[in-house]
């Protein structure tokens, strides 16, 4: 990670999690220490973040505990990075307070683990709720333009219009 960031001439300026499942917080301590960044999450993710040590033990995964949040992100807030404005969309269901980052001007959304190519986020982990996830997708993501590119937390990108038509979990 460090070498790629250096090779690309980048400088991390924020540490933001879409949600706090263990696979998304494993690097928080490293990133926070390396670039002196505070963690930003939705307040509703605190219980999930605080369960990180227990969950890592269940999976046998080494874990340097994440720092506590330095600030909280709320639905409708805007994040500006290098001139790109991203609006916070509240999309619970995969976790209690998942958020997505929508860039209207450039036509993309960072979807975390809410919506995937022909799939959706799992809801069998603590704080997950299938009906809530479906509602979030339909009311927060499926109202975006069809050509909006979705960059999920895992797997290939997709488009809102494609998922409306072909996602078997939503049709």
Task: Tell what function each PLM region has.
Residues 54-58, 78, 84-171:
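Metallo-beta-lactamase
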Residues 2-80, 165-169:
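Active-site HxH/HxHxD metal-binding segment of metal-dependent hydrolases
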